[in-house]
């Protein structure tokens, strides 16, 4: 696992309501994972990649790229946010990793969304340095 990405994810766990976080590549490899409360995403890389792929296809069907996917579960929502390979990239082909978060509840979604641009930039920078 990538030590720099793990540090970013550990910082992310300090955000109120974030229970688990991972950075997963489009092939399903977990590049880094951290959790404050199990279950985390250590062994769920393939599932995250499949959810990302399905969300991208649905976005294409609807005529737009995937910005973010939120899937609600009884155990709390999961947020999938594509991380562009290059700053400002908008082409879905430029997405190589996805930031995946498990939240305590829907009430935490607004707080996390407010901080996502900063978090995505940190993940992107750490991903580029490790590539």
Where in this protein do the model-derived segments appear?
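Non-catalytic interaction/Regulatory regions outside core domains
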Residues: 1-20, 26, 30-131
């Amino acid at each position: 696992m990538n030590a720099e990405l793990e540090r970013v994810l550990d910082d992310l766990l300090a955000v109120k309501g974030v229970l688990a976080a991972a950075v997963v590549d489009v092939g399903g490899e977990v590049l880094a994972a951290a959790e404050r409360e199990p279950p985390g995403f250590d062994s769920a890389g393939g599932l995250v990649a499949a959810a990302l792929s399905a969300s991208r296809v649905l976005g294409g069907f609807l005529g737009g790229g995937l910005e973010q996917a939120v899937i609600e579960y009884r155990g709390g929502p999961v947020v999938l946010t594509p991380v562009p390979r290059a700053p400002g990239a908008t082409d879905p082909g430029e997405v190589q990793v996805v930031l995946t978060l498990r939240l305590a509840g829907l009430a935490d979604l607004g707080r996390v969304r407010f901080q996502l641009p900063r978090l995505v930039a940190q993940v992107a920078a750490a991903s580029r340095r490790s590539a």
